[in-house]
Structures are given as C-alpha cells and as structure tokens.
C-alpha cells in the first residue's frame, strides 16, 4: 500500500472581506398590494418588511455576484488572481449546467480558480462558509470567495397572499483566507428532510416545461399528477416558492434557537461574549422570537436588514453583515453569531469574527 502525501494549509481561517449588491429598483409594499388583498400594515406586522429590491434584466445572478465579489475582494486587500476557489450558493440560477460560479470566476479575473455552485436554500451561505474554511485549512486554496446570490423575484407568485411580499433580490460575498488564530468557529449544521414540503417549489420543472421528455411521455419521476396551478387568466403559473408559514415559523423559532445555542457552545462562548447576531433575514417576527429565546443581552446588535431588503435566501446573511459594517452598527473584530435556515429543511450556524 502506497503512502498518500497530505497537504497542509493555514492553521485557521477567517473572513477577510465582505461585499454586497442590492438591485437599483426599490419595491415598496404598495406595489405588492396591487395583486393581493392585504395592507401595508398587515405586511409590516407579519414580516417587518417595508421594501425589497427587484433585479432588472441586466442585474443577472452573475452580474450581481461580480459586483458584490469585487467589493469583498477589495475589502480583503487582495486581488482576484489570488482567489483559489469560488463557491456560489443560489436557488435562482436557472441553467442546469454549467455552474454560474465558473462564469463569475472567469469574469472576475481569477487564475482558473476552482468554481462550483451549491444549493442549500437560505442556509447556503453557512454551507459555503464551512466549505471555504475547510479548503483554506486543508491547503487546496489560500483564498476562497463565497457568494450568496438570489433573484427570488423570478420565483415569486405575486398572487399568493402568503408569500408575495416576502422575497427580494441581491448578492453578498465574503473572502475567506488564512489566519494564525481561529476566527470561524465549528459549524453546527444539518437537515430535516421529513419537513421538505414546508418550503418548496410549487411545480417541478419536469411538469412545467411543455416540451420536456417526461411530460410529453405522460409521466414524471414521482408520478405526480396533481393539478397545475393557474393564474387569474387561466395560464399555468411559472414555478414559485411556497411555504407553510406557521410550520416554518414554529420550526425556526424553537428548533433554530437550539441550533444557535449549540453553535455558541461549540465555539466555547456564551451570549454575553457576543457583539452581533446575524440570523437569516426571513422575517422580523422570527428574528425577535429567536432573540428572546436565546436571551441575548441588550448590548448585542441584531441584524434587521429584512426591513428594507426582504428575504434574499442565500444572500441574506452576507448582505446583512455588509450593511452592519457599512453603517457602523458593527465593527471589524466584533464576534458574531450567524445562522441560516430554510428549504430542505436545512440549517447552518457558526460564530465568526467580523472582517
């Protein structure tokens, strides 16, 4: 048996820079109310959301990612050619192959960096951060670019009163690099596939696409023959994200608070040691309930980017992080608890030092 040589990278890893991009168009609740029977007061009371950003045709997944990444790379004080790997988390890049990460890596000017996409919903940034940390410590890349990016406006049913107001678009990115001390704690992550139906796409692509081989042959992999959802004019609706709101709320508040506490325990700190809490920006009621359940001290700054950005899934944590630092609500060196959770159901939580 031959001995395989091991490769060793940095002792530890840390976030070195962060960047964000929000589309130019700001969409107030009044626009959402044009197609649903609701009110601005109801939307704010149920979600905390006042506005969200919707991308134009030019603000593609790649374009937004490149803008956010350029800022993160500059913030880290390195050049794009030093990036050894690019990890993109998204559920709204509609081309099955190739991965959008390869286009982003090329257009940024990386030197043939490894590049791939992951799909972990609203926990995607945490998954990407964990992979990046492993690459830096293992030595497969000195610097890793992690991007969370979404165009959820493309997957929003504007006639669905339960979800029409929730989602927004944007991109957030961080550069993860070497460190002599631990600045990214152990990740507490997992999945609960028995709850997969609580957040899902309304119609699988193989049922929606009129010319798919499976549909034309009269079948699907799951044998799904349920009626296709129709819009007010009788047309088959484009697939959208749907969720069981109360079930998701209960799970997020009670189960994810436990996961957040586990991340604190794994990092060897308590809530008193925290400076910042950056949960997935799903809903301000969920955020408030988690703060209460975790009994966070008053000195802890809590990200509330959801008010003006909406739920941007994989992009929400890096976007919120970028805004807190840009506004001075948080500062470089602060200790932050981050937790993402969503469709799958999946989750990932860790403690980090802010760049």
Curated annotation (Swiss-Prot):
Record's keyword terms, sorted: Acyltransferase, Cytoplasm, Fatty acid biosynthesis, Fatty acid metabolism, Lipid biosynthesis, Lipid metabolism, Multifunctional enzyme, Transferase
EC annotation from Swiss-Prot or TrEMBL: 2.3.1.180
Location of the protein in the cell: Cytoplasm
Record: active site: 122, 280, 311
CDD domains (alphabetical): KAS_III
The protein's enzyme class: transferase
Region span, ACP-binding: 281-285
Positions of disulphide bridges: none
Top-level division of the source organism's lineage: Bacteria
Catalytic activity: malonyl-[ACP] + acetyl-CoA + H(+) = 3-oxobutanoyl-[ACP] + CO2 + CoA
Gene Ontology biological-process entries: fatty acid biosynthetic process
Pathway(s) annotated for this protein in UniProt: Lipid metabolism; fatty acid biosynthesis
InterPro entries (alphabetical): ACP_syn_III_C (IPR013747), ACP_syn_III_N (IPR013751), FabH (IPR004655), Thiolase-like (IPR016039)
GO cellular component, one term: cytoplasm
GO MF assignments: 3-oxoacyl-[acyl-carrier-protein] synthase activity; beta-ketoacyl-acyl-carrier-protein synthase III activity
Key word Protein biosynthesis present: no
Protein family: Belongs to the thiolase-like superfamily. FabH family.
Domain notes: The last Arg residue of the ACP-binding site is essential for the weak association between ACP/AcpP and FabH.
Assembly and binders: Homodimer.
Task performed by this protein: Catalyzes the condensation reaction of fatty acid synthesis by the addition to an acyl acceptor of two carbons from malonyl-ACP. Catalyzes the first condensation reaction which initiates fatty acid synthesis and may therefore play a role in governing the total rate of fatty acid production. Possesses both acetoacetyl-ACP synthase and acetyl transacylase activities. Its substrate specificity determines the biosynthesis of branched-chain and/or straight-chain of fatty acids.
Name the record gives this protein: Beta-ketoacyl-[acyl-carrier-protein] synthase III 1
Organism from which the protein derives: Streptomyces avermitilis (strain ATCC 31267 / DSM 46492 / JCM 5070 / NBRC 14893 / NCIMB 12804 / NRRL 8165 / MA-4680)
Gene from which the chain derives: fabH1
């Amino acid at each position: 048996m031959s001995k395989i040589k091991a490769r060793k990278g940095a002792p530890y890893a840390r976030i070195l820079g962060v960047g964000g991009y929000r589309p130019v168009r700001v969409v107030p609740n009044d626009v959402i109310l044009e197609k649903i029977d609701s009110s601005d007061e109801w939307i704010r009371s149920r979600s905390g959301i006042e506005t969200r950003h919707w991308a134009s045709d030019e603000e593609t997944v790649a374009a937004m990612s490149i803008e956010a990444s350029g800022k993160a790379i500059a913030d880290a004080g390195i050049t794009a050619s030093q990036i050894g790997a690019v990890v993109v988390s998204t559920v709204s890049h509609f081309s099955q192959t190739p991965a959008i990460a390869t286009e982003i890596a090329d257009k940024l000017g990386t030197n043939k960096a490894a590049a791939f996409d992951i799909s972990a919903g609203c926990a995607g940034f945490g998954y990407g951060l964990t992979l990046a940390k492993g690459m830096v410590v293992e030595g497969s890349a000195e610097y890793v670019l992690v991007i969370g990016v979404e165009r959820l406006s493309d997957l929003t049913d504007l006639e669905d009163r339960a979800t029409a107001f929730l989602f927004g678009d944007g991109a957030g990115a961080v550069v993860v690099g070497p460190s002599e001390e631990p600045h990214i704690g152990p990740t507490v992550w997992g999945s609960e596939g028995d709850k997969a139906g609580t957040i899902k796409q309304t119609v699988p692509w193989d049922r929606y696409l009129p010319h798919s081989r499976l549909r034309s042959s009269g079948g699907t992999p799951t044998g799904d023959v349920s009626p296709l959802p129709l819009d007010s004019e009788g047309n088959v609706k484009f697939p959208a994200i749907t969720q069981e709101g109360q079930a998701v709320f209960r799970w997020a508040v009670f189960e994810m608070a436990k996961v957040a506490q586990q991340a604190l325990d794994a990092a060897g700190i308590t809530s008193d040691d925290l400076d910042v809490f950056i949960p997935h920006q799903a809903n301000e009621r969920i955020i408030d309930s988690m703060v209460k359940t975790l009994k966070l001290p008053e000195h802890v700054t809590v990200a509330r980017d959801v008010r003006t950005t909406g739920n941007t899934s994989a992009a929400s944590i890096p976007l919120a992080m970028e805004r807190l630092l840009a506004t001075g609500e948080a500062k470089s060196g602060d200790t932050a608890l981050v937790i993402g959770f969503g469709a799958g159901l999946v989750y990932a939580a860790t403690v980090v030092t802010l760049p």
